[in-house]
Amino acid sequence: MNLDIKKWKEFKVSSVFTIHNGKGITKEEIEENAGNFTVVQSGEENNGVLGKIDRNYCEVMNYTFSDKPCLTVARSGSAGFVSFQADGCVVGDSAKILLLDEEIASNEVYTFLQTILSANRFKYAYGRKVTESKYMNDTIKLPVQYNEDGTIYMDASKKYSDDGYVPDWQWMEKYIK
């Protein structure tokens, strides 16, 4: 499969993902409320995983979590580090959860987007934090959908871009498979 990025178009991260900020979880909480639910913070080691906690505890504490596959991005520390969590996770205050719409979310699409987002990591080097406004307005280049006649498909609702481009989710999935 050819990877011709010259035809890719720019999309704001906020138009592709729903972004959720984490809330403070301590190591003590993880130890005292042990479980099977993955806790992600800002480190790169172990894919950002800090430990495992009881999922019900996370719900009671109103922590930010996803039961479905998602990406996480470190806000500080290893700022900009993106990890894929196939079984969902809860994030502490040093991380964010990035979710795709259910109809397009697949492990393969998440893996593709993880790689694309990781290419932007340099923007958060030298102590620059991943702030919400900065990350929401960050742009990534993605393959776009085409009509049968070879012209770019344009979405009148402009859900993903102000120009009407639509990411080619199927292409991303096939590329990873």
Name each model-derived stretch.
Residues M1-G24, E31-G48, G150-K177:
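Non-catalytic DNA-recognition/assembly elements of restriction-modification systems
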Residues K6, S14, A74, D101, ...:
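A structural detector for beta-sheet-dominated domains
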Residues K6-V13, V39-V40, C70-T72, S83-F84, ...:
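General detector of folded, globular domains
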Residues E31-E32, F65, T131-S133:
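Intrinsically disordered, low-complexity regulatory regions enriched in Ser/Pro/Gly/Thr
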Residues Q41-E44, G77, E102, V144:
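Short, flexible loop/turn elements at secondary-structure junctions
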Residues G51-S118:
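A short beta-sheet element
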Residues E59, Y110, V130-E132, Q170-K177:
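Extended intrinsically disordered, low-complexity coil regions enriched in Ser, Thr, Gly, Ala
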Residues S94-A95, L113-K159:
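Glycine-anchored helix-breaking recognition loops at helix->coil/strand junctions
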